[in-house]
Each structure stands twice: as C-alpha cells, then as structure tokens.
Amino acid sequence: MQWEVVIGLEIHTQLSTQSKIFSGSATTFGSEPNTQASLVDLGMPGVLPVLNKEAVRMAVKFGLAVDAEIGQHNVFARKNYFYPDLPKGYQISQMELPIVGKGHLDITLEDGTVKRIGITRAHLEEDAGKSLHEDFQGMTGIDLNRAGTPLLEIVSEPDMRSAKEAVAYVKAIHAIVRYLGICDGNMAEGSLRCDCNVSIRPKGQVEFGTRCEIKNVNSFRFIEKAINSEIQRQIDLIEDGGKVIQQTRLYDPNTNETRAMRSKEEANDYRYFPDPDLLPVIIEDSFLEETRATLPELPPQKRERFQSQFGLSTYDASVLASSREQADYFEQVVSISGDAKLAANWVMVELGSLLNKQGLEIEQSPVSAEQLGGMLKRITDNTISGKIAKMVFEAMANGEGSADEVIDKRGLKQVTDSGAIESMLDEMLAANAEQVEQYRAADEAKRGKMFGFFVGQAMKASKGKANPQQVNELLKAKLEG
C-alpha cells in the first residue's frame, strides 16, 4: 500500500526580551540555577503578573510578517497541569483568543518549487522551569530560571508531506524570527524548539490518520531524522496489523528511534479558563501601524530583489537571503567589488567553506566584508588572478591585513605585460619541444586535451602570476603559428 505522510509543527520561539513575560526577572541564558526567579515566577501567593509590552509587540511583528490576522482582542488563559518545574500548577498561555490568527508562509523546496504552508495561530505563553535529572543521584533538581520566559508558539496547518518539507518550513520560520530580531534562533540553547505531529494515511484518503507528537526536537538534522523514524514506525506498525495510538513521544538521536513518553492530551484535558489576574489585551490600530513600520525587508522580498537587482539564480538568492547577517555581508561585498555574481560565489563557496571548518557564523568571520570586497575588486581589475585570490583570501583569514597589503607584501601582483609573458612562454615551449611537436601533429580533439598541459606549465613557470586570459591567447598563437 502507498502511504501519504501528514505533518504539522508547533514551534516554540523564545522571545528576545530583556525580562520575563509577567515579571521583571532577567532572561539571560546560562546563569546559576534559581538566580533569575522572582516571587511571580515561583508562584508565591499574593503576587500578580504584569504583561511585558515588548513581548506583545514581538508577537504582533511576527503576525504581520506572515500576513496573519492579528487578534486585537486577545485573552490569556490558564493551562492546568502538574509538573515539578511548573510552580504555579498552571501555565499562563492563550487558547480561544490568541494574539495571532490564521496566516501563511511560503517555503522553497530543494527542486526550487514554492509551497505555501498555512499557519493556524501563534500565541504567547510563559515557559516552564527545567528539571535536572543528571546533577543529583537519585533525585531531580529544579531550576526555575527559565520559568516565565516569554514564548511565542507558532502552530502550522498539517500541510507538510515529508520530513524535508518540515525542515524547510522550520528553516523559514527560523530565518523570519531572526530577521525580525524577536528570537536569536539558538536551537542548542533551546531558543527555538519544535514539536512534530506526524500521521500517515493511505494515499488518496481524505481523513487524517492517528497522530503522534514528537516533543522538543532542537536541530534541523534531528527534526528530519525524528520525523522519518516516526513515519517508518507507524508504517511498520500498521502493516504488521497493529494500530497507532495517539501519544506524545521523544526522539533518541543515539538509537534514531522515537519512544513513548505519555498518552497525548487534548485541549480539554488541561481545563483552560481565562486567567482572572490578567485583563484582555486590546491592540489598537495605531499600535499595529507603528509596529508594521518597523518591519525589515524579509527573506522572500530580499530573495526576489537579489534576483532582479543582481541577476542571481533562485538558489543563490535563497541561500544569501537565508540570514539577515549573510544578506548584509553579501550586499556590502557587492557595493565594494561591483560584481554581484562573483561576490555570491565567494560568499557561498570560499567563505562558506572557511566558516564551516571553523564552526563560525558569518558575523564572526575572520575576513570582513570590506576585505573580501577589496580582494574581489583586484580580481575584476586584473591585479590578481582567481587562483592567486585564493592565496590572498587565506592570508586575510590568517590576519595578514587587507588584500592590497597581502598582494604588496607577497609580491602577488598579476603579470599583464605581453612582452614578459611571451618571453616566459618561449622558454617554457623550448623546454617542452617534444610535446609541442606532438601537439602540432595531433588532430583537433587531442589538441584540446594537450592544450591544458601547456597552460599548466605556463602558470607554473609564472608562479600563478601571469594573466590567464593573455596566457591562453598568446599560447594558442605560438602553438599554431
């Protein structure tokens, strides 16, 4: 039987506010346990929550960015459940009236096609604390630093049909929240976590199958692996005569398997009701327009502009626009070098390779945009060749200064004097007289292969400094003259 996969995602983004959503406690990551928890966060009696206006602004920003309905009358609710790291015995969230309603996001797939993914809603809520199972033998420690940290939970429609589509969607959300400056997107620190709802159904069937939710997956690679593992588990289970049970599961990267955590709850299990300590939030039109005016150019618009303004391919434009820092770096390189396609190639390939090897983000690049732009300018004005440029780039990455400083210090300036190149070619051809005779006696097909040998010898003789175009032209004339 052929199966169709149905995937919906819940993405929890930690908002980059200075303080928590209902208290003045700091949200700094990595502080000593329980040093950033106020009486409000601890759920002490007699204290009241006060809503963080900046968290509201950030949620509205996201809603506007995904063309969503904004809940101008939204309400906080209590989500009731017991867990040791939830000190109040309930989580303040939103249920019936969220701050962000229906919207959508277009994702670009590997084959270049664009698919629209519906966004059901996005709501504000507070994060829970953290249980520390490994720090105490036979006991569990509770760190409440994270309790009350503002989250925006983004819930998608079940519109994805493969793990790769799900990853593309998460990457698109990741890019948008970073562009907006509302979340740092640091998945290793838990700033962006994903719950994956996965079900299967016979191809052509309209009704959904029974879904399972994989909780708290925190990397793009693990999202893909966890979903594929769960898909295969459900297929094997049904084809062996079993039945999928609705449940919450955890992904174990060591075994590449999902395992049952608990039965999956429905909304009514949490007994939601409006929080009596918090008034409904009224968002005025003026607040909406003020927030809309602060929206930056977002990845889809930037991608389109890169294609139209710089003549880049869809793929190149998508890669360069995938992060705000990379897009800004690229544009600065272009403004200095004047050659967008050359800049795109160097930023994506050479610089990308360097950053991957060193485990750095582009904002930590050892080669600044000014340095790279200056070097590319020396390629376009024929001061250096592309081959020499790689040596210059490596030197800049090692802290040897600007391109001009490296070129002058190492004597790498390209030889463009025709007389000097001709003299060098004459010496090289004389040293390879036998190969010259073979070349002249060969047919056109063999000559093409042999010509590369002479070019290599010429560049070796000039230590890579001779202008490759001049070498090709003069060499051809001498060999066929």
From Swiss-Prot:
Domain of life here?
Bacteria
Q: Which GO terms describe its biological process?
A: glutaminyl-tRNAGln biosynthesis via transamidation; translation
Q: Pfam families per the record?
A: GatB_N (PF02934), GatB_Yqey (PF02637)
Enzymatic class: ligase
Which reaction is catalysed here?
L-glutamyl-tRNA(Gln) + L-glutamine + ATP + H2O = L-glutaminyl-tRNA(Gln) + L-glutamate + ADP + phosphate + H(+); L-aspartyl-tRNA(Asn) + L-glutamine + ATP + H2O = L-asparaginyl-tRNA(Asn) + L-glutamate + ADP + phosphate + 2 H(+)
GO terms of molecular function: asparaginyl-tRNA synthase (glutamine-hydrolyzing) activity; ATP binding; glutaminyl-tRNA synthase (glutamine-hydrolyzing) activity
- EC number of this enzyme: 6.3.5.-
Q: Which UniProt keywords apply?
A: ATP-binding, Ligase, Nucleotide-binding, Protein biosynthesis
Oligomer status and interactors: Heterotrimer of A, B and C subunits.
Concerning its family, UniProt says: Belongs to the GatB/GatE family. GatB subfamily.
| HAMAP family documented for this protein | GatB
* Functional description taken from the UniProt entry: Allows the formation of correctly charged Asn-tRNA(Asn) or Gln-tRNA(Gln) through the transamidation of misacylated Asp-tRNA(Asn) or Glu-tRNA(Gln) in organisms which lack either or both of asparaginyl-tRNA or glutaminyl-tRNA synthetases. The reaction takes place in the presence of glutamine and ATP through an activated phospho-Asp-tRNA(Asn) or phospho-Glu-tRNA(Gln).
- Any idea what this protein is called? Aspartyl/glutamyl-tRNA(Asn/Gln) amidotransferase subunit B
Protein source organism: Pseudomonas savastanoi pv. phaseolicola (strain 1448A / Race 6) (Pseudomonas syringae pv. phaseolicola (strain 1448A / Race 6))
Please state the gene responsible for encoding this protein: gatB
